[in-house]
Amino acid sequence: MLLFIDTANVDEIRAANALGVIAGVTTNPSLIAREGRDFAEVVKEITSIVDGPISAEVISLDAEGMMKEAVELAAIHPNIVIKIPMTTEGLKATRACMEKGIKTNVTLIFSANQALLAARAGATYVSPFVGRLDDIGQDGIGLIYDIADIFNNYDLATQIISASIRHPLHVQQSAKAGAHIATVPYKVLLQMAKHPLTDKGIDAFLADWAKLTPKA
């Protein structure tokens, strides 16, 4: 399973990329708004940092408007993937993008039926929101299992991006459930690298080494 970082903060993206584990970036209007910068400027800078898929989301609600934005965003860099909301208008735009060779990431997926529709419309990726489903008492990881089963049954090429990741266990569970990618906040990425027994082991090694070091 690949790891993307879910942020529009270029400092976080640079730091994550330096770890050598990030294969792409997902953004959305809310994340970019937090940065207080021009949308296209932020997206262009991100493409200069990470050599992989960069998801940038449209804000129009009609298919025609989505397509206009998609063409403009795709022109920024070949790695741009257009994030499109899971609506009937979004499905139309997804199909139109596919026909133009523009990669898409259909977002705000909360059911296997939605994922199937997006795949049939030609989506490159679908993004089921694990954490938001958990928030309302539903099984977010169970949805990843369901989508993976359906896609595998019919050899669908659309890849699953496990999104709305809240903690490291979501990442582990997503990998077991068959997600192709998990897109994680920077904080969660750092948490994945930590374990108290690792820290304890390092402290023990250093203490033992200090015993071998001659005192002045």
UniProtKB/Swiss-Prot annotation:
Its main location: cytoplasm. Keywords: Cytoplasm, Pentose shunt, Schiff base, Transferase. One of its GO terms (cellular component) is cytoplasm. SUPFAM superfamilies: Aldolase. It catalyses: D-sedoheptulose 7-phosphate + D-glyceraldehyde 3-phosphate = D-erythrose 4-phosphate + beta-D-fructose 6-phosphate. Gene3D superfamilies: Aldolase class I (3.20.20.70). Its EC number is 2.2.1.2. The keyword Zinc does not apply. The active site is at K83. It is found in: Cytoplasm. It comes from the Bacteria. Pathway: Carbohydrate degradation; pentose phosphate pathway; D-glyceraldehyde 3-phosphate and beta-D-fructose 6-phosphate from D-ribose 5-phosphate and D-xylulose 5-phosphate (non-oxidative stage): step 2/3. One of its GO terms (biological process) is pentose-phosphate shunt. GO terms for molecular function: aldehyde-lyase activity; transaldolase activity. CDD domains: Transaldolase_FSA (cd00956). Belongs to the transaldolase family. Type 3B subfamily. PANTHER family: TRANSALDOLASE (PTHR10683:SF36). HAMAP family: Transaldolase_3b. Transaldolase is important for the balance of metabolites in the pentose-phosphate pathway. This is Probable transaldolase.
